[in-house]
Amino acid sequence: MTAIRNVKGILGTKLGMTQVWDENNKLVPVTVVQADSNVVTQLRDAAKDGYTAVQIGYGQIDPRKVTKPLAGHFEKAGVTPRRHVVELRTNDSDAYSLGQELSVEIFEAGQKVDVVGTSKGKGFAGVMKRHGFHGVGASHGAHKNHRKPGSIGGASTPSRVFKGLKMAGRMGGERHTTLNLTVHAIDAEKSLLLIKGAIPGARGRVVLVRTAVKTTVKGA
């Protein structure tokens, strides 16, 4: 299926959060993303692949650590091997060329973007931390079960526990997308994106910044 909209995107590294002043002398919390060394490694077209897309590579890697098929893939694009690769479906893939370098200037201040990343891993967590359960009462007969989930519903009917029931387990470390964030500022010289608010992931993790899928219209 061919994309019906133009999507711009770039891979970067989350450096952390800070505060900056806006034009109204108000402090704005922003996340700093460094997005350098992005190159186009492959182009998809509807005639050959059935859809249009652009593949982007990011991050340097020792060529000795790259498999032979991937090494040939990067060599065909005329670029050095990259550690991370992502594909974006877009209707304007013909506007790109193999080996083209992408910078943070593909975005502009005030633009709405979505940020995709891997959330922080929390390890094995109980239902109160993982799902926000209230727990059992502090008294009135409660005995060593204050943080337990309670009944999981497996009585003689239906004689089983339903799939997807909220229970204790590993928390975090999952792919997460934060929608409709605003690009506060761009530093092209240092390849930095300043994005209002928080984005998923820990410092040093790779994130994808792309054109917003949905845009919120005030008063609509």
Curated annotation (Swiss-Prot):
Q: Which Gene3D superfamilies is this protein grouped with?
A: 3.30.160.810, Translation factors
- Which key words are in the record? Ribonucleoprotein, Ribosomal protein, RNA-binding, rRNA-binding
Against Pfam families, the record matches this protein to: Ribosomal_L3
Transmembrane parts of this sequence:
none
Which SUPFAM superfamilies does the UniProt entry name for this protein?
Answer: Translation proteins
Keyword match rRNA-binding: yes
Recorded hits in InterPro entries, A to Z, give: Ribosomal_uL3, Ribosomal_uL3_bac/org-type, Ribosomal_uL3_CS, Transl_B-barrel_sf
Where is the region Disordered? 137-159
The GO terms this record gives for MF are: rRNA binding; structural constituent of ribosome
What is a single cellular component term in the Gene Ontology annotation? cytosolic large ribosomal subunit
What GO terms in the biological process aspect are recorded for it? translation
**Complex and partners:** Part of the 50S ribosomal subunit. Forms a cluster with proteins L14 and L19.
Q: Its function? A: One of the primary rRNA binding proteins, it binds directly near the 3'-end of the 23S rRNA, where it nucleates assembly of the 50S subunit.
Q: Which family does it belong to?
A: Belongs to the universal ribosomal protein uL3 family.
> What is this protein's name?
Large ribosomal subunit protein uL3
